[in-house]
Amino acid sequence: MSITAQSVYRDTGNFFRNQFMTILLVSLLCAFITVVLGHVFSPSDAQLAQLNDGVPVSGSSGLFDLVQNMSPEQQQILLQASAASTFSGLIGNAILAGGVILIIQLVSAGQRVSALRAIGASAPILPKLFILIFLTTLLVQIGIMLVVVPGIIMAILLALAPVMLVQDKMGIFASMRSSMRLTWANMRLVAPAVLSWLLAKTLLLLFASSFAALTPEIGAVLANTLSNLISAVLLIYLFRLYMLIRQ
């Protein structure tokens, strides 16, 4: 059977509209978890204020020089802040991926579904999803740091891995290998969706500061919720595409 991107886009749009409230609640809950965890594990405001003390920002030619000019205590605070942001983001993304994929599975099986039920049903696979998303993010970030393009290619090639891990109960590395092979064979169907997702995320990041006009916490939750909705659309598309490819 010939698969067209247009038909998959149409199926994705229909599913997203029909399950919008459930997906919105999952996205909002994941955003709230991300913000709360980030706040809990981040340095205090007083510690963050120390990052500006005695650091010659104008004379630094890059991030590496800026970090080198920091005191050991400031470097530790920066490391803690970065780790808190990364960890909370990975947790939120893992719960989002598990919840959205379980919504699709439960709805496809004709069962009633709620946001809490979907997240609860995804609990057994969350540790594996967390590790998978961590490894994927690491590879993509390394690729982007090198020449940008390798990172984008890795993001495309590994896009189907979460779906395979949950749907086919594959191992972490098996799902990554299978995703690379299957995506490479169907690049014309996967690449445009992933590139659109990356573009939407980038645009959201550019306008993220405007959300802080409310309060930093509410702005962070709103920005993360929108980001999660964008990711949810991509997950629905990839799940539908994967099921069609397997037929």
Swiss-Prot record:
Membrane association type: Multi-pass membrane protein
Top-level taxon of origin: Bacteria
The keyword Coiled coil belongs to this UniProt entry's keyword annotation: no
UniProt GO cellular component terms: plasma membrane
Membrane-spanning intervals of the chain: 20-40, 87-107, 118-140, 152-172, 187-209, 225-245
Localisation per UniProt entry: Cell inner membrane
Main location per the UniProt record: membrane
Keywords attached to this entry: Cell inner membrane, Cell membrane, Membrane, Transmembrane, Transmembrane helix
Pfam families for the chain: UPF0259
Protein family per UniProt: Belongs to the UPF0259 family.
HAMAP family: UPF0259
NCBIfam families (UniProt xref): PRK02868.1
Protein name per UniProt: UPF0259 membrane protein YciC
Organism ancestry: Bacteria, Pseudomonadati, Pseudomonadota, Gammaproteobacteria, Enterobacterales
Name of the encoding gene: yciC
